[in-house]
Amino acid sequence: LEALQLERLKDMVAYAYDNTVYYKRAFDEAGVKPGDIESLDDIAKFPFCDKKTERETQHVGSFFGEMCSVPEEEVIFMATSSGSTGVPTVSPFTQEDFDLWQDTEARLFWQAGMRPNDRYVHGLNFALYVGGPDVIGAQRLGALAIWVGAVPSDRLLFVLKQYQPTIIWTSPSYAWHLGEIAKEKGFDPKEDFLSLIHI
């Protein structure tokens, strides 16, 4: 496993150096080259970026900034962080990135118990935050995806009763809140809703 990790690390560091303005400059300033990685421990010699650096470089130069490693025309999707700690940071995705993301999500859903005969409600928002397209991972697995998103609780309860999903993805606090609203509205979870797996 470590041999594979080392091989992938070497490839990634070389790719970053050869294809991004930021990492080439950062490595050169630190006096390191991709060829300096001979073991996994050698990663400690290389400079790391943080959120502050991401924000400072994301709009310098090209549209996606100095850290983007592909031309803008290869980007087919972009998302941003939530912005809870400052200016949102941008994540550009190529078609290959997007496909790998969906494959990864399908595997994660499978590990969480989702199967092709499941009905899945995505109860998180579909704004610029990267969570939205996870739904496609459920579809890739073969499950029925019900694209609800961030709707009022009354509407989500209607969807849960009407379409009887077997899986819902939302935050733990909102799942609790939804249960409280369901009680207030006179729903009986045992009778009105199927047994839900909460992801």
Where are these regions (language model features)?
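Nucleotide 5′-phosphate-binding alpha/beta core
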Residues: L1-T80, G86-D103, W110-Q111
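Conserved adenylate-forming
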Residues: D11, A30, G132-I197
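Residue-level signal for inorganic ion chemistry
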Residues: A16, S81, Y120, I168
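Conserved ATP-dependent adenylate/AMP-binding module captured primarily in the ANL superfamily
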Residues: A44, W101-R119, S153-P165
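Short glycine-enriched loops at secondary-structure junctions
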Residues: V75, F98, N125-A127, S173
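Conserved small/polar residues in nucleotide/adenosyl-binding loops
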Residues: S81, I197-I199
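Short, flexible loop segments at the rims of nucleotide/cofactor-binding pockets, characterized by
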Residues: D97-F98, L124, L144-V148
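Conserved AMP-binding loop of ANL adenylate-forming enzymes
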Residues: A106-A143
